[in-house]
A protein has these predicted regions:
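Beta-propeller domain segments
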Residues: 27-82, 154, 166, 201, ...
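Asp-box/WD-like beta-propeller blade repeats and closely related beta-sheet repeat scaffolds
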Residues: 130-132, 136-149, 155-156, 161-209, ...
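Blade-loop segments of beta-propeller domains
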Residues: 92-100, 112, 116-150
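Predominantly a core beta-strand signature of beta-propeller blades
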Residues: 85-86, 129-133, 180-184, 234, ...
Length: 433
């Protein structure tokens, strides 16, 4: 992980945004009230977490409390706000992770476990896809998917494996790869920048003008507890030309930026981040933020704007005042994964251009948190600092877990599509007009 980057110009999109004054009447939980668990989750509940709300390290012991997964109980169903409804679009997928919408409306899904990309097309009279097929297979833990160039007529679909970036020729409407796989970022022996181990997901997005590609690479370790660990070019967001050349670090000190997204109004790069473990139930907050070019976000020595990690006392004092505070602090251990922005037209206007992010759920906390999809309100492309429960209900009254959201995408008809790797399901959320 390097700490400096060269400057480059980023392009912004000049697009209008509707008035969101009607969404400002929500009551927001703040302070200690914002630090709850799954029993306080419900659609419409808003929270704001600040650095001042955070406890000192080790106020609670670190616990291993992973999700106890069970089949979906009879009658259990995701909960969404009044006026919305949830449908089971498809189930029995194998480890569905990221989902993206192609320009023609097809849904591309990374099934990371079996190493393939699946395509779903249309919607049948029974509510499921009309076409369900495999676009490409033989991949290595694929996660990120992006079409290039951005816009209505892409020529390639890019895939981020755990140790490389590849692409396939693509013509609008292709249901299977129409040409051979092409290497974009190679994993060279002993020097591959995207080598496996540690945090394995790699997301990728293109700048709005298509001139740059961003790839997120999580850390090898939790808090750099092993100084011999291979952390070079990890815990970073990397920037490349679309052909894989001109690699550089765009932002550093980001422990595990699982999800990347480009805001449709500003063109800003955003990320959703899994922060470090083993400091207690309410440390360190996961977060969602706009990514500042050349920015340093603290890992592993600091967190949340210059707070020293107690496992690295006195290390790198010269960096303390350079650590950026993220835009939206979530609860600790949410395991925030993918993020998208609502660019459809079927939700109420106050949702336009707001973020939706999947919270996969905790393991390092005595009381479970996460296991839901949240809304991230924005105003003219700037996050308000709050987040709101949107899709909950994946935890039983006994604390067992039957669903874990991963991917989020806006379908061509404006529905929000959510992958769930616990049940192998894609959920479809639409507004009831």
């Amino acid at each position: 992980m390097l700490l400096t980057t060269a400057a480059c110009a980023s392009s912004l999109l000049n697009r209008s945004e509707p008035d969101k004054s009607s969404s400002q009447g929500h009551q927001t939980l703040t302070g200690q009230s914002a630090l709850g668990d799954w029993t306080s989750d419900a659609p419409g509940v808003r929270r704001r977490v600040t650095v001042a709300d955070l406890p000192r390290p080790y106020q609670t012991r670190s616990v291993d409390n992973g999700a106890h997964l069970v089949p979906r109980p009879e009658g259990a169903w995701p909960k969404v706000p009044a006026g919305f409804k949830v449908e089971q679009f498809i189930t029995d997928l194998d480890n569905p992770r990221e989902i993206v919408t192609a320009p023609n409306g097809d849904l591309f899904i990374a099934e990371s476990g079996p190493g393939r990309i699946r395509v779903l097309r249309g919607r049948s009279a029974k509510g499921g896809p009309e076409v369900n097929t495999v676009f490409a297979s033989g991949l290595r833990q694929p996660f990120g998917i992006a079409f290039y160039p951005p816009g209505p007529s892409p020529e390639f679909v890019y895939i981020a494996n755990t140790d490389s970036v590849v692409r396939y020729p693509y013509r609008k409407g292709d249901l299977s790869a129409s040409g051979a796989q092409q290497s974009v970022v190679k994993a060279l022996p002993g020097g591959g920048r995207l080598r496996g181990g540690g945090h394995w997901t790699r997301d990728l997005r293109f700048r709005a003008d298509g001139q740059k590609m961003y790839v997120s690479v999580g850390s090898f370790t939790n808090d750099y507890e092993n100084p011999n660990a291979p952390e070079d070019h990890r815990a970073d967001i990397l920037e490349f030309n679309p052909d894989g050349s001109q690699e550089r670090i765009y932002a550093a000190g980001i422990r595990n930026a699982v999800g990347l997204a480009i805001h449709p109004v500003t063109g800003d790069l955003w990320c959703s981040v899994n922060e470090r473990d083993a400091l207690g139930d309410n440390l360190v907050p996961d977060y969602i933020t706009r990514v500042k070019e050349g920015g340093f976000y603290g890992w592993p020595w600091f967190y949340m704007g210059g707070t020293q990690d107690p496992r690295h006392p006195g290390e790198h004092p010269e960096l303390k005042n350079k650590v950026l505070t993220p835009d939206v602090l979530l609860e600790s251990h949410y395991a925030s994964l993918c993020i998208t922005f609502y660019n459809g037209s079927s939700f109420p206007k106050e949702f336009k251009n707001d973020g939706f992010a999947s919270e996969h759920g905790s393991w390092n906390r005595a009381r479970r948190v996460g296991y839901k999809v949240i809304r991230v309100p924005t105003k003219r492309g700037v996050p308000t600092g709050e987040f709101e429960d949107f899709m909950t209900g994946f935890v039983t009254a006994e604390g067992d877990v039957w669903g874990r959201p991963v991917g989020v995408a806006v379908a061509s008809d404006g529905a929000l599509m959510v992958t769930d790797d616990a049940s192998g399901t894609v959920w479809r959320v639409q507004h009831s007009r």
